[in-house]
Amino acid sequence: MWTKAHRARHDARLKEVVSLHAVGEVARWLERVDPPRSARATPYAAVVRGLAWHLRVGGAWRALPFGLIHWRTAYGWLRRWLGSGLLEALLRHVAGLRRRAAGRKPGPRLAVIDTQSVECIPVRGPRGYDAAKKVLGRKRVALVDADGTWLAVAIVPANVQDRDCLDALTPGKQAWPSLREAVLDGAFVAERCEAWCNLHGMRRRVVERDPAQKGFVVLERRWVVERSFGWLVHWGGLLRDRAGRLDVSAARVALAAVLSGGEALINPMPIQDAAS
């Protein structure tokens, strides 16, 4: 829950969502696992800084300001890291570091799954209309742990029903074999959702809102994934989906989660719930 302690930590954070220290840590990790092939290659720190600016401020790739790397270079490196699986590995690495910093085991046992529909600008690529949310765009499918740390993310057209989105999370779930329980909302009550959880060795727990309750209600466990979605509003480039490809769209969300996780490691918030 959001408490006075959380508010104090939030007010004490740096003005920028991404600090140079977080950018440097991400760049150093990438250099260790994917060393530059040439001494004249663009420094990874410059690449990550340009990508962070693009995600933080928003706008077209061509809008990267003078003084940062060329937009084609930034986009090319993002596609390269996406194709090689480095972004997914980096997301898992940061998630493990955050769990250790919170006093937890590296392998989570509880997963919280939810979706978020966002508008899509007029670009090429698949999209759809979410009749429930009245949104024309795409749907983000999030897999987070008990603290709201991002474990995996997938992107599907917004017209895909929530109960049909779990298949998109299969690669992300397979990367975390320690998961044993999944918390979902009432949109995942279909038998195919239970079958998906059973297939991956997880027990399904559906947390639904009481129809008699009015207004905003904090739901058990589910509030952490809503908070994770809420933190994305700090990234101007993620307020609307701008990517022409679904995998690039997922990579942009994953990179924002990595940079936010790196910043949280520098200035963490207190965690009250110690359940994994």
Language-model features: locations:
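Short alpha-helical elements
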Residues: 1-276
